A protein has these predicted regions:
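Surface-exposed loop and adjacent secondary-structure segments within mature catalytic domains
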Residues: 1-187
Length: 187
């Protein structure tokens, strides 16, 4: 965004206070990704870290704590105050941007590729991916499966977890691509 901010927060200016949900209001900054989206351009995020890590998250999220990647690491008071975890903000980017700036109509992020699958899946072995390395891959304690939510929002999109899935994507018919290639960072 190019705007002065404080250590430990994402997508907010220096008037936001770490851990204080109330300080989010009025302190959101425009990001280059948001400006491109509003201009009608295709947008994307590609990283080799967790896609919810502070650096990639700064393109799409507004959080008073860079560590709030899923609700299991958020204080109950923050959740009760309406703070949204970073993974959920990625899935809800289109809706959140349109709500923040009434009158705009965007089509959402076309490409999001990285690691951090655990931030999007519920803490339930039934939600594990085919290549899960942990007995329980997801960390979310709110029972939400954000991969399924993304698929419902973008039915003409593709979700991939590996090279085989990525190579099988038909760019001529796929409108969105969401790839989470590891539970955490990609090594």
């Amino acid at each position: 965004s190019g705007v002065k901010t404080n250590i430990g927060i994402v997508g907010l200016d220096e008037d936001a206070r770490r851990g204080d949900c109330a300080s989010t209001a009025g302190n959101q900054v425009f990001t280059a990704l948001e400006l491109a989206e509003i201009a009608g351009l295709s947008t994307g995020i590609v990283t080799n870290t967790r896609i919810t890590h502070a650096t990639p998250a700064a393109t799409y999220a507004k959080s008073v704590d860079r560590d709030w990647e899923n609700p299991s690491v958020m204080p109950a008071a923050a959740i009760a105050a309406g703070c949204e975890d970073i993974a959920s903000q990625l899935i809800n980017f289109e809706r959140n941007l349109e709500a923040r700036y009434p009158g705009i109509d965007v089509d959402g992020i076309e490409v999001a590729l990285g690691g951090g699958r655990r931030e999007f899946l519920p803490n339930d072995p039934a939600a594990n991916s085919q290549d899960a390395r942990s007995s329980v891959e997801g960390d979310r304690n709110d029972s939400r499966n954000l991969v399924e939510e993304w698929a419902a929002l973008y039915p003409r999109g593709d979700y991939v977890i590996d090279q085989v899935g990525f190579d099988a994507v038909d760019a001529a018919t796929s409108e969105n691509l969401f790839g989470l290639f590891n539970e955490s960072e990609m090594h």
